[in-house]
Amino acid sequence: MNDTAEQTKPVLLGKIDLSKAGRNCKMYLGDLTGNGRKDLLLVQPDGGIDDRYIPHQVEAMTAFDIEGNLLWQTGTPSDDPGGPGSDYPVQIYDIDGDGYNEVLCVMDKAFFIIDGKTGEVKKQYELPNEFAHDCIVIANLTGNSYPRDIILKDRYHQLWALNHKFELLWTHKGNVGHFPWVFDFNGDGRDEVMAGYDFLNADGQLLWSCSELDDHADCIWVGKVQQQTEHNQLVIGGSVTVLYDWKGEEIWRYNGSIESQHVCLGKFRSDLPGLQIAGLDRIIRGTSYSDGRDGIFLLDADGQEIWKENRETGGWLTIIDTISDWDDSGLDYILAYRRGGNVLPTIYDGYQQVVATFPVDGYVSFDDLVGSGRKQVIVYDQTTAYIYANEFIDLSQNKLTALPQDKRSYSVTLYPGGEYVK
């Protein structure tokens, strides 16, 4: 059975002028005002650092609604900001449980909880370490009714776990990768932590580590990959792509890549059992946007290669992610952007066929912006955001209740990880 999708032209729903936010911003999406629509938070990083070794802080944040109205700004956009070479320490999440989202960020060497509606500071805390601001991970380590603990980390070596009062719970040193993923594997109401190649319990105790893997973990995904499994498994992309069970047994490894820079899980094919794993192989590291070479590949649930892209254009910095509910096909797709070589952001199906190509280049954010049940895609550059959908939808309708922030939306990272728990 061939379930390839029909290619459609994306519908432009709106354009937003982002110039007031400054250059080199990353976009975060969340309902900041509580009106049932996602808003846009543009975050500019600090400059003057080498982000291969030193983590970013926030220089400025600028919030817009999805019609382009400026909501608030904190900090002053710099004419010489840092670049997007690593994560920015920001998340949008209702950390205090009052029904409205806050913005969590590290700015001016401190951790801030900011009112999403106004941009005003609600709380401020001292960092546990001067370098503990590479990213922000929201977790449930203490058995609360909802996640309200925080994990901070430096670039590659140490992480710090704190409770909702910002009291230190524990710290861990190891090969912690880029963005640790938290998940309650054993069902005790507390999250375990996959910190790079190290698997920790909720108290920070090392239970096991991946073996014979080089470099560091770039992306981590959780899901029941194999159809016969009763338990969630871990897909880790690093020097190679591996599948582990949550107790530390390696199930398979895929050695057909040079550098497995990104992985993502999804039901990309209906003719194959279990889930499929899309990956991005960084084949030749380049020195600019459009030299070097990378390629997308797809694996089945047992780690066997289904196909691998043979790019004829340059480009080595592609980011891929799973996008669900773009249309009514019932299948997931692979969204690829930052491709280089004049290749525009594109949605692919599980047969490597193009579902949609966006007519502008840039970074990409996507979410269900108004609770419609469908995802919209925002492509943005230094000055403009373009909002696209598979078909027209009215984005102007306010609702009486706030739009909740799901885990994917409060776990934003340059190295997309995730969980597939449908």
Language-model features, listed with the residues they occupy:
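Beta-propeller-forming repeat regions
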Residues: 1-422
